């Protein structure tokens, strides 16, 4: 027994938090995305990793995008967590625009949440999918 006693309930989309960045934090975040920083979560001693964002070449300029949605896929067997992974959803990313730039106008990506980040708050969301597996805890 792992001590995990969760209930297997899927979460379609839920708000995790909302953050407003200072100008210094904004620049640090931009640099972290440009330098391919990643996060690590650990659930029941199972590590999960993912990038905090990505850069995309648009009109000859690389623009940093912050991943603002995380999807967790959790597999269980009985009351034991067997596998845990996390992925990002590119449809729910936020472009980090330079607040001093004239380029802070809406872009062509209708599905992308756009923010100047130092002027607006950025909402972070998550979803969870639970699946049953026959893999025993001893083989996780």
What are these regions (language model features)?
Residues 1-140:
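Soluble extramembrane domains flanking the early transmembrane region of eukaryotic membrane proteins
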């Amino acid at each position: 027994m792992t001590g995990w006693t969760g209930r297997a309930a899927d979460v379609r989309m839920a708000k995790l938090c909302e953050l407003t960045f200072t100008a210094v934090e904004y620049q640090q975040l931009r640099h972290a995305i440009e330098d391919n920083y990643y996060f690590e979560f650990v659930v029941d001693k199972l590590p999960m990793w993912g990038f905090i964002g990505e850069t995309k070449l648009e009109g000859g300029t690389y623009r940093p995008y912050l991943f603002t949605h995380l999807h967790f896929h959790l597999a269980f067997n009985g009351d034991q967590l067997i596998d845990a992974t996390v992925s990002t959803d590119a449809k729910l990313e936020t472009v980090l625009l330079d607040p001093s730039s004239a380029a802070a106008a809406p872009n062509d990506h209708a599905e992308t949440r756009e923010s100047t980040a130092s002027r607006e708050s950025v909402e972070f969301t998550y979803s969870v999918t639970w699946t049953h597996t026959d893999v025993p805890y001893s083989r996780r």
